[in-house]
Amino acid sequence: MLIAVDHGNKQIKTVHTPPFTSGLIQSDTPGFGTDALAYRGKYYTLTDQRIPYRRDKTEDERFFILTLFAIAHEIEAMGQYSGSLMRVQLAVGLPPAHFGVQAKRFINYFNGRGAVAFQFKGKPYAIFIENTACFPQSFS
């Protein structure tokens, strides 16, 4: 399944779902939101408070977690949810000013993670990112 995610400094954008702010809250306990995502023993919810500007989005896991939200939203929007492992080809977008310097690092940020298990809205997801292609924003 091909999923395109535009990783803006202000918003995350996908093809089939409305954009959402590039911000999240991490907790050790499940939150109250229905759109909670659980990954590696932590719980995440989206927030309208965006992550402070980051020249390098691979410095920590936050943009990976935001990508998991985007992938889950896209799978739901396309009616493709499956309780089994889903193979994903990822097309990602970076701001044009950072594309030349960071494209390879951003591709490596997503590739090579193996099967990624998480829960979204209480449902278990398992994805395997087979390949990642990186484009300047608005082209992914």
What are these regions (language model features)?
Residues 1-140:
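Nucleotide/phosphate-binding catalytic cleft detector across ATP-hydrolyzing
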